[in-house]
Amino acid sequence: MSHSVKIYDTCIGCTQCVRACPLDVLEMVPWDGCKAGQIASSPRTEDCVGCKRCETACPTDFLSIRVYLGDETTRSMGLAY
């Protein structure tokens, strides 16, 4: 089953999500949008098992990273009924 990982611009570059991911789906890449100068990226979403440990580890008030599991992706986009 395919999962979608979305990184929002509220990411503060803390690396908590990257360290929490047991399958190294995430990595940090350079970004000028925060003090840390980096943002999480999800180049290997095909390896995501949907454990959502990255979401749990995110310290921002608005989760900067979200994992949408299979059909949940289309529901969240209003494409499923």
Curated annotation (Swiss-Prot):
SUPFAM superfamilies: 4Fe-4S ferredoxins. Its cofactor is [4Fe-4S] cluster. Keywords: 4Fe-4S, Electron transport, Iron, Iron-sulfur, Membrane, Metal-binding, Oxidoreductase, Photosynthesis, Photosystem I, Repeat, Thylakoid, Transport. Binds 2 [4Fe-4S] clusters. Cluster 2 is most probably the spectroscopically characterized electron acceptor FA and cluster 1 is most probably FB. It holds the Pfam family Fer4_7. GO terms for cellular component: photosystem I; plasma membrane-derived thylakoid membrane. InterPro entries: 4Fe4S_Fe-S-bd (IPR017896), 4Fe4S_Fe_S_CS (IPR017900), PSI_iron-sulfur_center (IPR050157), PSI_PsaC (IPR017491). [4Fe-4S] cluster 1 binds at C11, C14, C17, C58. It is found in: Cellular thylakoid membrane. Its main location: membrane. Residues 2-31, 37-68 form the 4Fe-4S ferredoxin-type domain. It is a peripheral membrane protein. [4Fe-4S] cluster 2 binds at C21, C48, C51, C54. GO terms for biological process: photosynthetic electron transport in photosystem I. It catalyses: reduced [plastocyanin] + hnu + oxidized [2Fe-2S]-[ferredoxin] = oxidized [plastocyanin] + reduced [2Fe-2S]-[ferredoxin]. One of its GO terms (molecular function) is 4 iron, 4 sulfur cluster binding. Its EC number is 1.97.1.12. PANTHER family: PHOTOSYSTEM I IRON-SULFUR CENTER, PHOTOSYSTEM I IRON-SULFUR CENTER-RELATED. Apoprotein for the two 4Fe-4S centers FA and FB of photosystem I (PSI); essential for photochemical activity. FB is the terminal electron acceptor of PSI, donating electrons to ferredoxin. The C-terminus interacts with PsaA/B/D and helps assemble the protein into the PSI complex. Required for binding of PsaD and PsaE to PSI. PSI is a plastocyanin/cytochrome c6-ferredoxin oxidoreductase, converting photonic excitation into a charge separation, which transfers an electron from the donor P700 chlorophyll pair to the spectroscopically characterized acceptors A0, A1, FX, FA and FB in turn. The cyanobacterial PSI reaction center is composed of one copy each of PsaA,B,C,D,E,F,I,J,K,L,M and X, and forms trimeric complexes. This is Photosystem I iron-sulfur center. The gene is psaC.
